[in-house]
A protein has these predicted regions:
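Acidic-aromatic/histidine active-site loop/patch
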Residues: 1-9, 302-316
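Walker A/P-loop phosphate-binding motif and the immediately C-terminal alpha-helix
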Residues: 3-45
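Hydrophobic anchor at the start of a short beta-strand
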Residues: 38-39, 122, 144, 225
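Hydrophobic residues in beta-strands of the RecA-like P-loop NTPase core, especially within AAA+ ATPase
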Residues: 41-42, 124, 229
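P-loop/Walker-type NTP enzyme "switch/lid" segment
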Residues: 44-120, 176, 183-196, 206, ...
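Conserved catalytic-core segment of NTP-binding enzymes
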Residues: 127-264
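Conserved GTP-binding G-domain of TRAFAC-class P-loop NTPases and closely related GTPase folds
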Residues: 222-224, 230-244, 248-255, 270-306
Length: 316
C-alpha cells in the first residue's frame, strides 16, 4: 500500500529565459531518481512547457491544464517514464487559461504538489520572469534554486527575481505582523523611510517595533535561495584555486549585503557542448553524455541537496 506524506519540494527558477532552468531541473530530477529518490518532475512553466523534449518524451496527453481545469488531480496526470524512480507531469501546452490560472485554481494546484502517493521529492521546472505564479511556486518549495549565467544581464535579472520573491513572501508575513503601513510607504521608489533594498526595509521595521522586527527577520530568514551558475568558463570554474566559483560567490555575497537575502552557492556548471548535442538527440544529458563534465557537476549538485536539510517551508 502506498503512503501519502509531504514530499520535499525543490523549485528551479531563473530571472530570465535561456539560463538553463530546464536543463538543471530535468537532470537534477534524473540524478535524484538514480540515487533512489522516488522523484516527480513537474513542468510548471505554465506558458512554455518543454521539459518533455529534454527528457526525450512525446508530449503527454494529460497535462497541468487538466489539473487547473479540475478534470484530473496531479496524481492522475503524473506519468511513469522510462527512467527508474521518475514520474513526470507535463506543463500546460497551448492553453491560455491554464497559463494564467485564477487564485483558487493556483492554490488548489499548490496544495496537491508534494502530496502525491509514493513520492520522496518533487522538482518544479518554473517559467521565466517575476510573475506571481512563478514566484508563488518558487516560494512554495523547501529548497529554491535560482539558475544564473555569468553575464551582467543575467545577474541583474537574478537580483530582480530575488528581490521580487522577497517582497512576495513579505506580503504574506505583513498580514500576520501588522506591518502593512511600513510596506505601503516602502513600495514607493522614493520614500520617506529611505528604503531602497530588502535590508533597508527590515531595518525600518526594526525601528518601528523591534519585537516585530525580530519576528519578521526570523520568518524571512527561512527564504534561503541556492544559486547555480550555468555555462561557466574555465576562469569562473577554477581548479580549486581562489577563483573557484568566484562569480557565484560574489553574487551570493551581494545578495546578503545589499538585499539581506542569505543566498548560498549550490553549484557551478561548466559550459559544455554536450548539452546542445543531447537536446538535438532528444535524450537526457546524463544518458547522451554520461562522462561529460557538466553531468558530473549536476551529480554533485544532487549530492549536495541530499546532504543538506531543507530550509524552506511549504505554504499551506
Amino acid at each position: 500500500m502506498t503512503e501519502t506524506r509531504s514530499a520535499r519540494i525543490i523549485a528551479v527558477g531563473g530571472g530570465k529565459g535561456g539560463v538553463g532552468k530546464t536543463l538543471v531541473s530535468t537532470n537534477l530530477a534524473l540524478a535524484l531518481a538514480d540515487r533512489g529518490q522516488r522523484t516527480l518532475l513537474v513542468d510548471a512553466d505554465l506558458g512554455g512547457a518543454n521539459a518533455h523534449t529534454v527528457l526525450g518524451l512525446a508530449p503527454p496527453l494529460s497535462t497541468l491544464s487538466d489539473v487547473v481545469e479540475r478534470r484530473a488531480t496531479l496524481a492522475d496526470v503524473a506519468v511513469v517514464t522510462p527512467y527508474r524512480n521518475l514520474r513526470f507531469v507535463s506543463g500546460a501546452l497551448d492553453d491560455i487559461s491554464a497559463a494564467n490560472p485564477n487564485h483558487s485554481a493556483k492554490m488548489r494546484l499548490l496544495r496537491q504538489i508534494g502530496r502525491v502517493d509514493g513520492v520522496d521529492v518533487v522538482v518544479l521546472d518554473l517559467g521565466a520572469g517575476t510573475g506571481f505564479n512563478t514566484l508563488d511556486f518558487f516560494l512554495l518549495a523547501h529548497t529554491s534554486v535560482l539558475v544564473v549565467l555569468p553575464e551582467p544581464t543575467s545577474v541583474e535579472n537574478a537580483y530582480r527575481f530575488l528581490k521580487a520573491a522577497f517582497f512576495r513572501r513579505l506580503a504574506v508575513v505583513e498580514r500576520v505582523y501588522g506591518i502593512a503601513d511600513v510596506l505601503e510607504v516602502a513600495r514607493a521608489q522614493r520614500n520617506s523611510l529611505g528604503v531602497h533594498t530588502p535590508a533597508d526595509l527590515l531595518a525600518a521595521i526594526d525601528r518601528k517595533n523591534p519585537d516585530v522586527g525580530r519576528q519578521v527577520r526570523a520568518q524571512m530568514a527561512r527564504f534561503e535561495p541556492r544559486l547555480v551558475l550555468n555555462q561557466a568558463l574555465p576562469g569562473e570554474l577554477g581548479r580549486g584555486g581562489d577563483d573557484d566559483g568566484q562569480v557565484a560567490r560574489d553574487m551570493a555575497s551581494a545578495c546578503r549585503r545589499f538585499l539581506g537575502i542569505p543566498a548560498r552557492v549550490l553549484g557551478v556548471l561548466p559550459e559544455d557542448d554536450a548539452v546542445r548535442r543531447a537536446v538535438r538527440q532528444r535524450q537526457p544529458l546524463r544518458l547522451a553524455a554520461p562522462e561529460s563534465a557538466i553531468k558530473r557537476a549536476l551529480d554533485a549538485v544532487a549530492d549536495r541537496l541530499l546532504q543538506e536539510p531543507a530550509h524552506g517551508e511549504v505554504a499551506a
